[in-house]
From Swiss-Prot:
Species of the source: Methanobrevibacter smithii (strain ATCC 35061 / DSM 861 / OCM 144 / PS)
CDD domains reported in the protein's UniProt record: EPSP_synthase (cd01556)
One annotated GO biological process: amino acid biosynthetic process
One GO MF term attached to the UniProt entry: 3-phosphoshikimate 1-carboxyvinyltransferase activity
Protein name: 3-phosphoshikimate 1-carboxyvinyltransferase
Length: 438
């Protein structure tokens, strides 16, 4: 189906940001590993998160959706694969990466697979790092990608992993580490990208009762301790158990970026609820980006207010710790005056699509002048109406719909927003943007 803007009324009002996808994944997974019954409130039930729920059920967790929370009766780390066929994770790269380590805790073999897109995601860096911990996880097709066969056994010990490919590899090892036989000492080699996502993992692990020691050192005595290229992070996780708890999922700054950007682009005033001032989410960076581009932002304990005249200016921005903002910022840049330089997002090339390449190719269809680089792009403001393709990437579909605030736009395969933001159309309507699928 194609997504387009139907009508626009005065932009503004009040809308609640959807629950965090990242925290929802982690909450159901940790609750499934915990001893006892957990209640997860404000859970996001998107396609990706449902993939995590389904695999946790297959491995032994008892998960029930109640009226206003998700009840999870945990396994206390004692997993058993009840599925007689490969477990299909759909398009959820987060689920695949997080569960590859965890599946080794089962007492029988597990095969994790997914759709065609998921089967293009590189997994070799994770499986090689796990091998040093006594985990046998291998690509069935021998290409380093899903389907992944994971055999029982997780000894633990010491390993290292590159920090510049996917923070989910790091989170995967961290989450599974307390349930290994001997604990884990993990070294993250520079450059450590998307660090806030790992901070989120450590944060929620603490909520479920697990302690992590984190320190860092530099490669050589004469290295600059502030240099990202010299710093090696060490995470020490002893053998422990997860404890059940009641957990409330906070709002998602990634998804809220589309609501905030809509107000910034068109002009207006809005209050976005459920966005927490002390959040560890890296995508909170969107607030600083919009400020620099010309919007007025006020941050309160649990909501954000934005006002804008609709006149934005180009900026320079490093998205190394917030790669999921790439497409939103690219659209803001295309609708702003001047030039915007986006850097630090080489790791966005291994998302649902090569997001640097697909964003650039679709912007060019709209007459945008830009230059593509290995780790980002330079965009000159100026864009026209047209038709683009989402490449079945949920973030591309939602971000490009923002073009419709200024120009006619139609996005092919636009229905894929269900992956992360099921009520995207309804939320946009609450601030005055009527979208339709045709």
């Amino acid at each position: 189906m194609n997504l387009k803007v139907k009508t626009i009324s005065n932009i503004g009002g009040e809308v609640k940001a959807p629950p965090s996808k990242s925290y929802s994944h982690r909450a159901v997974i940790l609750a499934s590993l915990a001893d006892g019954t957990s209640k997860i409130h404000d859970m996001l039930f998107s396609q990706d998160v449902l993939s995590s729920i389904n695999v946790c059920r297959a491995l032994g967790a008892n998960i029930t959706k109640k009226d206003d929370y998700l009840e999870v009766i945990g396994t206390n780390g004692k997993l058993h694969n009840s599925s007689e066929v490969p477990i299909d994770l759909g398009n959820s790269g987060t689920t695949l990466r997080l569960m590859t380590s965890i599946a080794s805790l089962a007492d029988n073999e597990v095969i994790l697979t997914g759709d065609d897109s998921l089967q293009t995601r590189p997994m070799e860096i994770l499986t090689e790092s796990l091998a040093s911990l006594g985990v046998c996880a291998a690509s069935i097709n021998g290409n380093g990608k899903a389907p992944i066969l994971i055999k029982p056994g997780y000894v633990g010990g010491e390993t290292n992993i590159l920090g510049n490919v996917s923070s989910q590899f790091i989170s995967s090892i961290l989450i599974s580490a307390p349930l290994s036989e001997n604990g884990v000492d993990l070294f993250v080699l520079p450059e450590f990208k998307s660090r806030p996502y790992v901070n989120m993992t450590c944060d929620i692990m603490a909520k479920f009762g697990v302690k992590i020691e984190n320190e860092f050192f530099v490669r050589h005595d004469d290295c600059d301790r502030e240099s990202k290229n010299c710093r090696i992070d060490e995470f020490k996780i002893s053998k422990q158990e997860y404890k059940s708890c009641d957990y409330v999922v906070e709002g998602d700054y990634s998804s809220a970026s589309y609501l905030l950007a809509a107000v910034a682009i068109y002009g207006g005033n809005a209050k976005i609820l459920n966005l927490f001032k002390d959040s560890k989410q890296g995508d909170k960076l969107i607030l600083n980006i919009l400020k620099k581009m010309g919007a007025k932002i006020e941050i309160f304990d649990d909501y954000v207010e934005i006002s804008s005249e609709g006149n934005l200016k180009g900026i320079d921005v490093d998205l190394s710790n917030a790669p999921d903002l790439l497409i939103t910022v690219a659209i803001l840049a295309a609708l702003a005056d001047g030039t915007t330089n986006i850097t630090g997002v080489k790791h966005a090339r291994v998302k649902e699509t090569d997001r640097i390449a697909t964003t650039c190719s679709e912007l060019k269809k709209l007459g945008c002048k830009l230059k593509e680089f290995e780790d980002g792009m330079s965009i000159e403001g100026g864009i026209r109406s047209g038709v683009v393709d989402s490449h079945k990437d949920h973030r591309l579909a939602m971000a490009f719909s923002l073009v419709g605030l200024k120009h006619d736009i139609e996005i092919k395969n636009g229905e894929v927003f269900d992956v992360s933001f099921p009520n995207f159309i309804e939320a946009m309507s609450e601030i005055g943007v009527e979208l339709e699928l045709i």
